[in-house]
Structures are given as C-alpha cells and as structure tokens.
Amino acid sequence: MEFPGGNDNYLTITGPSHPFLSGAETFHTPSLGDEEFEIPPISLDSDPSLAVSDVVGHFDDLADPSSSQDGSFSAQYGVQTLDMPVGMTHGLMEQGGGLLSGGLTMDLDHSIGTQYSANPPVTIDVPMTDMTSGLMGHSQLTTIDQSELSSQLGLSLGGGTILPPAQSPEDRLSTTPSPTSSLHEDGVEEFRRQPPSQKTVVVEAGKKQKAPKKRKKKDPNEPQKPVSAYALFFRDTQAAIKGQNPNATFGEVSKIVASMWDSLGEEQKQVYKRKTEAAKKEYLKALAAYKDNQECQATVETVDMDPAPPSQTPSPPPVAAADPASPAPASTEPPALSPSIVVNSTLSSYVANQASSGAGGQPNITKLIITKQMLPSSITMSQGGMVTVIPATVVTSRGLQLGQTSTATIQPSQQAQIVTRSVLQAAAAAAASMQLPPPRLQPPPLQQMPQPPTQQQVTILQQPPPLQAMQQPPPQKFRINLQQQPPPLQVKIVPPPTLKMQTTLVPPPVESSPEQPVNNSPETHTVEETTPETICEMITDVVPEVESPSQMDVELVSGSPMTLSPQPRCVRSGCENPPVVSKDWDNEYCSNECVVKHCRDVFLAWVASRNSNTVVFVK
C-alpha cells in the first residue's frame, strides 16, 4: 500500500504470490470528498488449488497495528467509506475435495473497518454479500465466521465508522445477531416456526376446554301450565274476528281483542277467570302426580361382586351386642353358604347427624344380618334360598317382625347383628311418635346390590332421594303384592333383659303411580292380603343356594285412590254437553255450532257495550 502526496490518493493492492492480485489494478480515490463510489467487483481467475485460508491470507498486508492512530483523526477529518463488493465466481475454491459450485457467501452482521495512518482516515468496508446468484447446486456452502475474518484480516471492528448492513426480512425477525450465518439462518427459521405452533396449541386447548351446552329436553308427559283469562278470551274471539276480516293482521286482531276485553263486563270476565282458576287447580294436581311418578320410578343397576372362595366352610357368624353407648366399628359379613339377609340402611333422612359418631362426616350405616327364620310365614321361599326384605326404616336389635305375624326365635349361632347408636335413637324417637299419624312422605329409596348366587347374600343400600332397586341376572325372582295392617312394620328391640321396648314404625303412604315391572322370570306368583289401610312397598330378591324351578320376586305395590275431577262441560253458556277432543277449540266446546254461537255472543256483547255513535262495519 502506498499513499503518494497530492490531491488524489491511490490504493494499490499487491500480492507477490498469486497472479490474480496484480499491482496493475489501482483504484482512484478522491480525498476528503462527500461522495461514495461504487467499485466494480474484482474478476478472479479460476484456480482450483486455492483454499479459503489462501484467499484470506492475502489480506494480512492490510493490517498494520503500529499505523493505527487515536480517534482524533476521526473527529477532525471526515471519514471516507469505500464499498468493495467482492464477487467470487463459480469453481473458485475447492475444499476437502468438494467443488464449491454454489459460490461462497459471507454475510457480515457488522461492517469491518480499520483506520489508516494517512492524513484522511479511510475506512474500507468489505461487505461480502450479494455473491454469485443462481448457482446454488447440490454442493455444500462454506460459511466464514466473523471472528475468523477478524483474526485473519487483522481489522478492528470498533475503530472506524461502522455502517449497518441492510436488513433483510429474516434479519428483522432476529433479536440478536448470530456470529455464524448458518446458525443465524437456523435461529431465524426456529423463531419463525415457534410462535405459530404455540398459538395453535393454545387454540386447540381452548377448543377442548369449551364444552357444548346441552339443553334439557322437556318431558312430553309433564303437564302444561294454564293460560290467563285474557288468553282464553283471545282464543275465543280471534277466530270470529279472522272469519269476518280475513285480511286483518295479527296486530290489528290484537288491538280489537284488547278493546273488546276492556269493554267486556265484569261478569263475563269472571267466567274466564273462574276457568283459569279451575285450570290452575287441575295443573297443580297433575304436576304433583307427575312429580310423584318421577320420584317413584326405579333405576335398576347390577353390581357384580366377587364370589366367596370355595375352601371356605360355613361357620356361625359372631353376635354383636347392641350397645347404645358405642357404635359398631365395622360391619360383619355372614358366611358364604349360610341363608341370611344383609340390610344396609342409611338413616340420614330420619335421624339427625350425631357429632360424636365414630366416623366423622360419614353417614351412620346399620347392617343387619338376619336369618330366614325371622321372616313371616306369608312369604314362602324355596329351600336353601334367601329373601331380602327392604322396609321403609330398618331398626332392630334382636328381632324383626313384619305385619302381625310372630317372630320366630333365633339362635345366637344363626344371627349376627350390628346396631349403631343412631339406630337406637331412631327407635326411641319412633316409639315416642307412635301415637302421631304418619306423615305423607315418599318411602326412602331402595338400592339393591346383589351378588352372585355362590355367596348367598344380598346387600341393600337405602338412600333418601330416588327409589332405586338393583337386581342381578343370576338370581331368579317372584313377585308378591302385600298389603299390610296399619302398623305394617313392627320392629322389636330386645337388648338385655332389663330393657324392653317395642317400637312400631309405619312407613308413609305413597301416591299412586305407574309401577315399572322388574320381573324377568317365567313364573310369577301373586299373594295378596287385602286390607283397606296403608300399603308398604318393598322389593325382595331370592338367591337360592341350589337351583330350583320355583323362583320368587317379592314386590309390594303401593297406591292410594285419587279423587276424580268433576266432568268438564262445554264453555258456551247454557250448554251441558261434554267437550269434544279437537285441536281447533282446545277441547272446550262440544261442536262447531257452540263455537260459532259463543263467539257471536261475545262479539255482539262487545258491540253493544260500545258507544252508540260508534259504527262497526262487519263484512
């Protein structure tokens, strides 16, 4: 490099080793000018023996650490910039035996500059972008690191004026520059791909979390609410008005009906009001019957339980004394082959929750294991069978008596009972309220959890809200309709000899409702004891130990007579005929003549009530 004095400076690049950097090529650089000159690219001869290190090595002459001066020159003199785009043609370099047919791309994130010791400091920017285009073939691309160029060229990055390169759309997406162009491109691709995937995931998660709203379907059997007196009047008069004025719109008809209703006499209005009141009463009765029917419908579920191991031998279950001071800690299961009854009754609806109960927060459950000798003689069973009786409220300690039948004596070896404190309290409360009439409440729900026939026991869980009976496929059933005496269920508690107490529990009567049959057996036996009093409802499953042809399913059908509403009559005054079912007049008239006469009477009364000056034209 030489900078001869004068107005013009010349930059000469010489290279003794390689012929493509000849000293004959000089670049004219005016001193202290404000203009920038675009220098054409240097044409390089194709030499396959050159490598990247050879090309970069010829820029070592440009670095002169001793010639760099302080920054006062930059502040005192204007800095001149030379843009030197270097183009390297196809087949210039060969590295590792692979032909670099795609060209060499060197993208510098920051321009490289240096200061020279000449009077006007000159900064040489060598942006190596915009290389040979269109030559991207199957070969690999060679990327030169910025730090490598800095070390090879010996150029200081912060000494001269740094020109920011033109940013591409990909560069604008990147937040921090990467030292390597390949890493920079990978980071850009990763940055461009990452946000859409995250957004997609968020949208999909939001879609999954959003649950569609389901509207509750209206039961067609539910009774419809009655309409008002004005609505009844509107039904009666709009047909006559539409018949006389076919072209009248609904708004006009509504205005006419409203004026007719306002001018209607109080007596005629009372007729419609009485009809509305009667319809409301009928609606309330029908709604009460509908709700009773919904509550009494049984939901049948089957619960399969593991059978008992075959090696188990029948042994008498232990007997737990009924201690009113301490509840039983656990329930006892009977032997697998012993004929017995297991009843689980949750008395939460009849007994207040006790804070001092053994299991905090859990409902008090009483499990009664009763042998078949305790059942009344009116219920017949097959030999070796087991009958499960579910009364409305089960409270017992030593015996269970149904109806007026006597209770057979039970040996301690055949009976195991566990009675909690809440059961005894319920029995005491029931004994205190024996003289009171039974409240009209629905019987507690029955949920039966049967087992396979090998275990020979049935577990029944009672819960207050819905009436549920659970049956199992293997057992065979029979059906019996029982009507018991006014005290249909007598529970006799005989703890120690010193304490004797007899409690009568009367299950509440139930409104009559259609009963869902649960009988699946071919044989059905019906036994009835007719009494005009209350009827108790229970479902009993028989699980015989030995398969026998006679099978029974006991079910008590509850019902009570309903008062019939008076016979409806035709709406037209003076007509005593019953109404005819028709959609046109809402089952309120007996014939078309009554409809016409009634509408005519109403319309004429409305016309007569208007002022005499008002003229009504009827087409």
UniProtKB/Swiss-Prot annotation:
Residues 223-291 bind DNA. This is TOX high mobility group box family member 4. The modification Phosphoserine is found at residues 178, 181-182, 315, 548, 550, 558, 560, 565. It is found in: Nucleus; Chromosome. Residues 320-337, 512-524 have a biased composition (Low complexity). Keywords: Chromosome, DNA-binding, Methylation, Nucleus, Phosphoprotein, Transcription, Transcription regulation. Residues 208-218 have a biased composition (Basic residues). Residues 183-193 have a biased composition (Basic and acidic residues). A motif (Nuclear localization signal) lies at residues 213-218. Residues 153-227, 304-337, 507-529 are annotated as: Disordered. In liver, recruited to target gene promoters following treatment with dexamethasone and cAMP. Binding is decreased in presence of insulin. Residues 307-319 have a biased composition (Pro residues). The keyword Phosphoprotein applies. The modification Phosphothreonine is found at residues 176, 313.
